[in-house]
């Protein structure tokens, strides 16, 4: 005990215990009095002004900042330290089969046109992008721009549907055929036009009325039957029974082929399309009809409910003619390339004619296809027939000679420039025309696909032709085998005026415009 504490204790009496709190309080009061006395004798503090030339930056910090503090090293900032094993990525080589992968670097937030080096093998460098066929932009002065701006800023993709018409009522017997509204077509590239067109089509289709009232109802059923036949004959299950059967649907649209994928009993579906509205509709369609329990064993798969989708599905928005498959899928579905690729089938329905705008796009598409397919896997597609187009040109079967247009009341093809008299297009890329199909496609630019050129390019990518026929021949030869397998409503929707089934009249010429094809990837 200190002398001071002893003195306090004695003043309280020898029998009184020392109260520590009381001692502390008294000591504190005494110390405060001494400080107040010393403060009186101190000179007043001098006020520091900004213009006194004194550095006061350190005065605002509570920490001692003498500039000689030792920096603690860390594995995050010491280059001499080795990265611990737990921090190393296990997937640094996950895209080696698609191409070399360099260390990612910081990129500016503004979009740039430089290709991602990680997917160099997925990209095609053989064609100069400056050679791309572009639509010449219209010359617009600043004053004209100001006048047009308010109108053009109305987004093409969200044109108001037929909500003000009686046809918006589901009980109405009226039907409104589809019409697109795309601003400034001449100043837009094909991607923008196609995206806007199909976004509008997706939105307006909800308000058109019953599809059975469509002027191309029978034609749609016919085309669907062709796709059932092609997929039914050529989707081959994975030879490894432990692997799922996977189909990659490029340019999948609104998911119109989901029923066909259930028909061929796939286990996994991957859909990609350039139209975000179409992708949303495809996902919605899948979600509404997905089976509650997905069969996982061979026995349960035999008892799958074909009225529901007994397969898993994922959807992504992307341009498979300009971007690699990993670039489109991996950001939204990490690990999907390792988990589901290579796939058993790539489906490309009514879309490849958009790629033939440039050779670069075709090479990118075929790179995506061959890198995605397993050996023995198939590429199944439908495209306009270059033979059909050539015959129309050679026979001068134009309904409008001046405008270079052929077709009928259901469909039409209008060339951008005079086609060659012999119907053979050289060079084979960028030979454009505008295609219209009543209630489906409204004057959208497409490009001639010279099939032998396409076939030669496929062979360069290890894809060999297995099947090629026009729609009429496919139907006549294959429909007897599928007549009892297809949905009754689909079959009845193809009934002709003579009681038989198939296409007739204007519809027959419109469906004759297309062919179906199948390529198989070579390899062991």
From Swiss-Prot:
Residues 214-522 form the mRNA cap 0 methyltransferase domain. Keywords: Methyltransferase, mRNA capping, mRNA processing, Nucleus, RNA-binding, S-adenosyl-L-methionine, Transferase. One of its GO terms (molecular function) is RNA binding. It catalyses: a 5'-end (5'-triphosphoguanosine)-ribonucleoside in mRNA + S-adenosyl-L-methionine = a 5'-end (N(7)-methyl 5'-triphosphoguanosine)-ribonucleoside in mRNA + S-adenosyl-L-homocysteine. Residues 68-77, 100-112 have a biased composition (Polar residues). It is found in: Nucleus. One of its GO terms (cellular component) is nucleus. MRNA binds at residues 223-224. The keyword Methyltransferase applies. The keyword Membrane does not apply. Residues 1-155 are annotated as: Disordered. S-adenosyl-L-methionine binds at residues 227, 251, 273, 319, 349, 354. It is an enzyme of class 2 (transferase). Its main location: nucleus. Its EC number is 2.1.1.56. The record marks 254, 260, 285, 353, 446, 514 as: mRNA cap binding. Residues 19-40, 90-99 have a biased composition (Basic and acidic residues). Belongs to the class I-like SAM-binding methyltransferase superfamily. mRNA cap 0 methyltransferase family. Responsible for methylating the 5'-cap structure of mRNAs. This is mRNA cap guanine-N(7) methyltransferase.
């Amino acid at each position: 005990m200190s002398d001071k504490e002893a003195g306090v204790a004695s003043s309280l009496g020898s029998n009184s215990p020392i109260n520590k709190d009381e001692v502390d309080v008294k000591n504190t009061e005494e110390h405060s009095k001494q400080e107040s006395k010393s403060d009186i004798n101190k000179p007043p503090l001098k006020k520091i002004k900004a213009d006194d030339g004194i550095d006061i930056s350190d005065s605002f910090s509570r920490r001692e900042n003498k500039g000689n503090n030792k920096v603690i090293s860390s594995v995050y900032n010491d280059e001499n330290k080795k990265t611990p094993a737990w921090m190393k990525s296990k997937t640094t080589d996950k895209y080696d089969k698609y191409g070399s992968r360099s260390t990612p670097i910081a990129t500016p937030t503004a979009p740039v046109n430089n290709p991602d080096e990680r997917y160099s093998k997925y990209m095609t460098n053989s064609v100069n992008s400056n050679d791309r066929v572009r639509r010449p932009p219209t010359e617009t002065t600043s004053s004209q721009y100001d006048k047009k701006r308010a109108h053009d800023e109305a987004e093409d993709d969200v044109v108001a549907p037929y909500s003000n018409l009686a046809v918006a009522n589901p009980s109405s017997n009226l039907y409104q055929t589809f019409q697109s509204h795309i601003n400034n077509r001449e100043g837009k590239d094909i991607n923008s036009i196609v995206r806007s067109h199909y976004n509008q089509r997706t939105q307006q289709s909800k308000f058109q009325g019953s599809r059975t009232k469509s002027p191309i109802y029978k034609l749609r059923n016919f085309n669907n039957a062709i796709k059932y036949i092609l997929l039914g004959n050529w989707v081959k299950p994975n030879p490894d029974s432990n692997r799922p059967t996977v189909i990659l649907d490029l340019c999948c649209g609104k998911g119109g082929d989901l029923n066909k994928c259930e028909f061929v009993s796939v286990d996994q579906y991957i859909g990609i399309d350039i139209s975000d509205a179409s992708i949303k509709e495809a996902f919605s369609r899948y979600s509404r009809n997905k089976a509650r329990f997905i069969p996982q064993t061979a026995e349960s798969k035999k008892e799958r409910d074909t009225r529901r989708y007994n397969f898993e599905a994922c959807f992504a928005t992307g341009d498979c003619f300009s971007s690699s498959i990993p670039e489109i899928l991996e950001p939204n579905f990490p690990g999907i390339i390792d988990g589901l690729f290579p796939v058993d089938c790539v489906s490309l329905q009514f879309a490849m004619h958009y790629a033939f705008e440039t050779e670069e796009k075709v090479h990118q598409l075929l790179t995506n296809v061959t890198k995605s397919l397993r050996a023995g896997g198939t590429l199944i597609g439908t495209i306009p027939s270059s033979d059909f187009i050539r015959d129309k040109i050679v026979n001068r079967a134009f309904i409008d000679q001046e405008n270079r247009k052929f077709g009928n009341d259901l469909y039409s093809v209008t060339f951008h420039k005079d086609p060659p008299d012999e119907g053979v297009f050289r060079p084979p890329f960028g030979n454009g025309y505008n295609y219209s199909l009543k209630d489906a496609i409204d004057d959208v630019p497409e490009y001639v696909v010279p099939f032998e050129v396409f076939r030669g390019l496929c062979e360069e990518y290890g894809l060999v032709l297995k099947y090629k026929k026009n729609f009429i021949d496919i139907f006549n030869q294959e429909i007897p085998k599928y007549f009892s397998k297809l949905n009754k409503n689909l079959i009845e929707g193809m009934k002709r005026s003579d009681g038989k089934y198939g296409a007739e009249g204007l519809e027959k010429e419109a469906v004759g415009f297309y062919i179906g094809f199948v390529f198989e990837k070579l390899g062991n």
